Regions:
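Conserved ABC ATPase "signature" region
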Residues: 112-141, 194
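Conserved ABC ATPase signature
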Residues: 146-150, 154
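Short helical segment in ABC ATPase nucleotide-binding domains corresponding to the A-loop/adjacent helical element
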Residues: 96-104, 112-116
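The feature captures the beta-strand-to-loop junction immediately N-terminal to the Walker
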Residues: 41-43
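Helix-to-loop junction immediately C-terminal to a conserved catalytic motif
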Residues: 56
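Conserved ABC transporter NBD signature motif
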Residues: 64-75
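A short, proline-enriched helix->beta-strand linker immediately N-terminal to the Walker B motif
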Residues: 165-169
Length: 281
């Protein structure tokens, strides 16, 4: 696969009133090929979420360049989907309307929704939304429910469907499963990895959990800081080959132990979670 994303000497610095500028990322270099599943680990405050926002186009670097398909990063568009840790569904819209809102607004805006053509396209959008509902393991009866009638896991499935209906080339997921209970979290991991295998979408998934990263990723990228006052950068990368996985798709326990040791040694004392029993195959 060819190169899709390139981060070149990225620096991000925030100005704060009455304090010295806070540098979050410094000299960060990373290249990602089309179709990769990149799991991003690192201690709190090392710039993982900032990196996702840069790729999304929601934030600009202070230094360096973000390239998508060889082009300087444009504004956010449908080619980059985003699933945050706390899903942001519209509470006054049904599940179906939450999913179709993005493509409807992109194609028609507010005024365009008054045209006859919108009514035709809306039927098409809703048919597509039903397909993603099924793909996410939701029932047809869930389509007309409101977010507060759904469990946390079901709401997160809707949030992923919101992103997928835009058919992004790149899907950015920022600790998207961290608030879920272990059983739901495991279900969502399997679901997302299956979607990745079927669609070939390039995914960047931020997590604090090493075992989760090793299960999901084809490559684990560790961000870290040399000291508490330093800024984040890539300090370690590890490919996760298919040969390390058991029949279930999870890495075998001995492989998790081996790769976890490599990552922890590179983490320079940063706290990372390891919930091995839950993920080991």
């Amino acid at each position: 696969m060819g190169e899709l994303i390139r981060l070149e000497k990225i620096g991000v610095e925030y100005q704060t009133r009455g304090h010295a500028p806070k540098k979050v990322l410094d000299a960060l270099d990373l290249t990602i090929a089309a179709g990769e599943f990149i799991a991003v680990c690192g201690q709190t405050g090392c710039g993982k979420s900032t990196m996702l926002r840069l790729i999304l186009g929601a934030e600009k670097p202070t230094a360096g360049r973000v390239l998508i398909d060889g082009q300087e990063l444009p504004r956010p568009d449908r080619n980059r989907g985003y699933v945050p840790q706390k899903y942001s569904l519209f509470p006054d819209k049904t599940v179906l309307d939450n999913i179709t809102f993005g493509p409807e607004m992109e194609e028609f805006g507010l005024l365009g929704r008054l045209t006859p053509r919108f009514r035709t396209r809306r039927r098409e959008f809703r048919e597509t939304a039903h397909k993603y509902l099924r793909q996410m393991g939701l029932q047809e009866s869930d389509a007309n429910k409101y977010p507060d009638q759904l469990s946390g896991g079901m709401q997160q499935r809707v949030a992923i469907a919101q992103a997928l209906i835009m058919r992004p080339k790149i899907l950015l997921m920022d600790e998207a499963f961290s608030a879920l209970d272990p059983a739901t979290r495991a279900d969502m991991q399997k679901l997302v990895r299956t979607l990745w295998a079927e669609t070939g979408t390039t995914i960047l998934f931020v997590t604090h959990n090493i075992a989760e990263a090793l299960y999901l990723g084809t490559r684990v990228v560790l961000l870290g800081k040399e000291n508490p006052n330093a800024s984040g950068r890539v300090i370690f990368e590890l490919a996760v080959p298919d040969s390390a996985r058991g029949a279930s798709g999870y890495p075998r326990r001995e492989e998790i132990e081996r790769m976890t040791k490599l990552i922890e040694d590179a983490a320079m004392g940063g706290r990372l979670e390891v919930e091995m029993a839950e993920f080991a195959g």
